[in-house]
């Protein structure tokens, strides 16, 4: 577990070290250096000298835990001040066990499952000597932007909640039995020069950073390579990070700024060689204030203290204290748990899922059903295929490829001559089957390729009992032969346990509870579905919306009832829009959500408290300000299925929202917790 900060003992250690450190050693606390080739003795010896001289703070690219411990021993026992090292690495969606990709995980809306997944990732990273994860990378997917980068959702609030859950998992914030690793909140995908880089992007990054930092200590934060045009705006907006008693973690953009100032250059990337001697010279010439270097070095020392490195055991004591880590079986179970919660049932009318006795003979169509590398998307592998999952459950099925094989790693695109025979064979097999399950892989830009569309169109001429399962990044709800398919399950890239999760959902061993983290826009290719849409094997109804104004917050509530015949999980979502004069924006902003489990016939009142974080907006100076005005507040099961009303927020209540604390005894949140 990462030690919470601030801490008086930590400040004493940091203060004492800074008093003894030379300017060169302080600059060395900002130097991330690539590990040497173990076979190159000269390079390894030179690297060891740099550690002894205090010119290295972090080592990238270590090959094993033993190598990390060897470097750590040099730093602690042979350097002048014995300051330990960090070992950073990209952990992404898994080290040994591959978890669902960012957009797939976002569909779960389950922060506990995401935190548990990151705890496993931290354990596996720690077993390799890594103690600093260069993630999570926060991002959102606006309509029309494509899915070329990892994204959490199209709604900033969901992206912020997921980022906080990932940080808590990596840093083992809720589990004292785990070591944890430092996390780094990476906002570069939002603030990159290639993006629009405007005021809205900065406000979104502020909302994410503020939400994550409110949950507890954050090891580090990175803004990436903002260009000169946006750098001043960023520095002004995020100035709160530098204030006394504010953010305690490492600010990697400050390292870049110091390096660029010392080199007299426009821009320096994280991971570039840190010009230690140039920084020393710039400070001696008073081109860089020593206080800036002291602050940056102090943040690194605090991070190392929080990680427990100043009391790090070495040698035999380290082996004795390592204890037992979760086994691969437990890790895979955590991956399976999250993967099942990521599946989104887009359509099921008539109710063809779950598969059962009435499903009759099952025909599985699509080469993607056999693909063990598609679910991990090049992040490791292999994972479990859909066929693997069905066979483990003992489900009898027949198989047809549906389309001709493409070259290795080739994507399905236009029809080829061999497709005609494959489609014909699939249609003949479909005539002799009661239920057809079609499994498709990556679909470019969220639409069917020509060959895939022809396959589904041909199948629909011989049967209506088609279940479509999609494994691509983006969800799709295709229009085939003039209308939507009866049953569509979007799984996405679910990682190591993908096939087992999908098979359990298809057969009813588990129930779907995922929600769309991005809307499917309506077009000639897709019927279109709203953000937050996702069906269940149970049925839910939302009624009795109430909006109440208190002295310092707003309470919105509605009653959720399970009208189905089985238990289920529903995600109730809160949306807010603010009138701009007489204009009401078409886009609703997600501001909160709650997952609720109900038995058949059971009902529960779901309450949301809205204060400054929910109704406020970030200003250019980084302040979150709530203003009076007319708000449109909606509670729903998706952005397209809501109950809503307008409420006038007085200026006095808006000003008082800054002092409201959620969850105090007697508050709505406290009542919900006790219910």
Each language-model region and where it sits:
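N-terminal beta-rich core of secreted/periplasmic extracellular enzymes
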Residues: 1-186, 201-272, 280-309, 335-351, ...
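Short, contiguous strand/loop micro-motifs
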Residues: 107-109, 196, 266, 326, ...
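Alpha-helix boundary/capping detector
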Residues: 43-44, 85, 151, 326-329, ...
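Short helix-loop capping/hinge segments that flank enzyme active sites or metal/cofactor-binding pockets
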Residues: 299, 307-313, 317, 440
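Feature marks short, surface-exposed loop/turn motifs that line or immediately flank catalytic pockets
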Residues: 95, 141, 191, 371, ...
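Eukaryotic compositionally biased low-complexity/IDR segments
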Residues: 188, 194-199
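C-terminal non-catalytic regions of proteins with extracellular/luminal or membrane-system context
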Residues: 1-8, 41, 127, 199-212, ...
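Flexible, acidic loop-helix segments that line cofactor/substrate-binding pockets
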Residues: 311-329
């Amino acid at each position: 577990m990462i030690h919470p900060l601030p801490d008086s003992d930590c400040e004493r250690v940091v203060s004492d070290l800074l008093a003894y450190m030379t300017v060169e050693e302080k600059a060395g606390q900002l130097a991330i250096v690539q590990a040497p080739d173990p076979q190159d003795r000269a390079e390894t010896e030179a690297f060891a000298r740099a550690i002894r001289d205090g010119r290295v703070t972090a080592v990238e690219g270590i090959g094993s835990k033993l190598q990390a411990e060897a470097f750590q021993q040099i730093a602690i026992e042979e350097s002048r001040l014995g300051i330990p090292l960090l070992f950073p690495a990209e952990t992404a969606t898994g080290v040994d066990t591959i978890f669902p990709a960012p957009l797939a995980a976002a569909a779960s809306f389950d922060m506990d499952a995401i935190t548990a997944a990151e705890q496993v990732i931290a354990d596996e990273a720690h077993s390799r000597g890594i103690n600093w994860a260069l993630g999570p990378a926060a991002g959102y997917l606006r309509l029309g932007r494509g899915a070329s980068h990892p994204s959490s959702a199209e709604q900033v609030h969901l992206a912020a909640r997921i980022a906080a859950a990932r940080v808590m998992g990596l840093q083992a914030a809720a589990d004292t039995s785990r070591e944890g690793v430092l996390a780094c909140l990476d906002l570069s995908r939002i603030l990159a020069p290639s993006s629009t880089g405007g005021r809205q992007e900065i406000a979104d990054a502020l909302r994410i950073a503020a939400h994550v930092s409110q949950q507890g200590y954050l090891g580090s934060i990175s803004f990436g390579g903002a260009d000169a045009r946006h750098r001043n705006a960023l520095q002004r907006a995020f100035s709160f990070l530098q204030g006394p008693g504010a953010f305690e973690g490492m600010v990697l953009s400050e390292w870049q700024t110091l390096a660029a100032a010392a080199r007299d250059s426009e821009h320096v990337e994280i991971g570039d060689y840190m010009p230690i001697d140039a920084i020393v010279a710039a400070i001696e010439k008073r081109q860089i204030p020593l206080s800036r270097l002291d602050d940056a070095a102090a943040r690194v020392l605090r991070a190392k203290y929080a990680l427990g490195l100043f009391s790090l055991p070495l040698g035999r004591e380290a082996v004795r204290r390592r204890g037992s880590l979760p086994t691969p079986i437990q890790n895979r179970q955590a991956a399976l748990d999250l993967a099942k919660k990521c599946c989104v049932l887009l359509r099921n009318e008539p109710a063809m899922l779950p598969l059962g006795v009435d499903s009759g003979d099952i025909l599985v169509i699509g080469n993607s059903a056999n693909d063990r590398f598609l679910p991990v998307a090049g992040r490791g592998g292999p994972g479990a295929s859909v066929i693997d999952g069905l066979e483990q459950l003992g489900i009898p099925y027949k198989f047809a490829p549906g389309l001709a094989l493409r070259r290795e790693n080739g994507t399905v695109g236009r029809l080829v001559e061999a497709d005609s025979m494959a489609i014909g064979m699939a249609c003949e097999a479909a005539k002799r089957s009661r239920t057809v399950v079609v499994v498709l892989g990556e679909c470019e830009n969220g639409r069917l390729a020509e060959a895939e569309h022809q396959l589904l169109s041909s199948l629909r001429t011989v049967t209506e009992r088609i279940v479509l399962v999609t494994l691509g990044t983006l969800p799709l709800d295709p229009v085939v032969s003039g209308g939507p398919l009866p049953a569509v399950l979007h799984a996405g890239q679910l990682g190591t346990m993908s096939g087992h999760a999908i098979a359990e959902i298809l057969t009813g061993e588990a129930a779907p509870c995922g929600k769309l983290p991005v809307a499917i826009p309506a077009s000639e290719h897709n019927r279109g579905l709203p953000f937050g849409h996702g069906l269940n094997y149970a049925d839910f109804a939302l009624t009795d919306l109430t909006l109440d104004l208190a002295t310092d917050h707003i309470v919105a509530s509605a009653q959720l009832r399970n009208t189905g015949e089985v238990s289920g999980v529903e995600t109730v979502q809160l949306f807010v829009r603010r009138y701009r004069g007489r204009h009401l924006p078409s886009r609703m902003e997600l501001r909160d959500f709650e997952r609720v489990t109900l038995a058949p016939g059971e009902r529960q009142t779901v309450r949301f408290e809205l204060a400054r974080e929910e109704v406020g907006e970030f200003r250019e100076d980084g302040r979150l300000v709530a203003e009076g005005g007319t708000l449109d507040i909606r509670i729903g099961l998706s952005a397209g299925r809501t109950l809503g009303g307008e409420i006038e927020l007085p200026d006095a209540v808006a000003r008082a929202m800054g002092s409201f604390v959620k969850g105090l005894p007697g508050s709505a949140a406290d009542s919900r917790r006790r219910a």
